[in-house]
Amino acid sequence: APSVAKIRYNPGHLHHHEKSLPWQEKVKRIAHWAAEGDTALRIGVNCGSVDPAQKQLWPPEDSVSPMVASALEHSALLDEIGFIRYTVSLKDSDPALVIEANRNFASTRPEIPLHLGVTEAGLPPDGVIKTRIAFEQLISQGIGDTVRVSLTVPNEEKYQEIQAGREILDDIASGRVRSVVQYQTDGPNIISCPSC
């Protein structure tokens, strides 16, 4: 992958491929290929596809702990094999869970760069509001190194994701934090894939 700067892999998806191989061997293979191509990695943990082995260790109502445990486990393996060019992301469609997961991870491994995002945030303006809540709370505490805004918009309108991200970051930098506004939590929560 010499022309690719960074590749994301999802720890939860590793269990569905080559089931006879332990996940550690799969990660070592990914890291080897990345090192050969001078490519960084992102350990992309997503609420919808958490490592099944980790999920079994926690109560069903606790979705954050298995995400954080999976990210810590994969980070430790990459450290152990000497692969240091990696970041971590912990994404959920609920901004409160994104905040909790990233705070928990950052408190344990503050030296690892974090990529922030709210997955399947939905349509604007709600998708922007959800993302803003997470980014404002985390970035204002020094948590987060890169960001992605995921909105359900047609491909020709994907520029809205970049515009929203820039506006949120500019507002945070200028001290214009808006997340004191209560985001509705008692009505329907529309969750949708950014490309669907």
Where are these regions (language model features)?
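Glycine-rich tight-turn/loop motif centered on a GG-T
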Residues: 4-26, 53-65
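Short amphipathic alpha-helices and their capping/turn segments at secondary-structure boundaries
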Residues: 23-40
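Active-site cofactor/substrate anionic-group-binding motifs, chiefly glycine-
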Residues: 1
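Catalytic alpha/beta core domains of metabolic enzymes, predominantly
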Residues: 31, 46, 55-196
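Non-cysteine beta-strand/loop elements that form the S-adenosyl-L-methionine
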Residues: 5-12, 40-47, 114-116
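Feature marks short, surface-exposed loop/turn motifs that line or immediately flank catalytic pockets
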Residues: 49-51
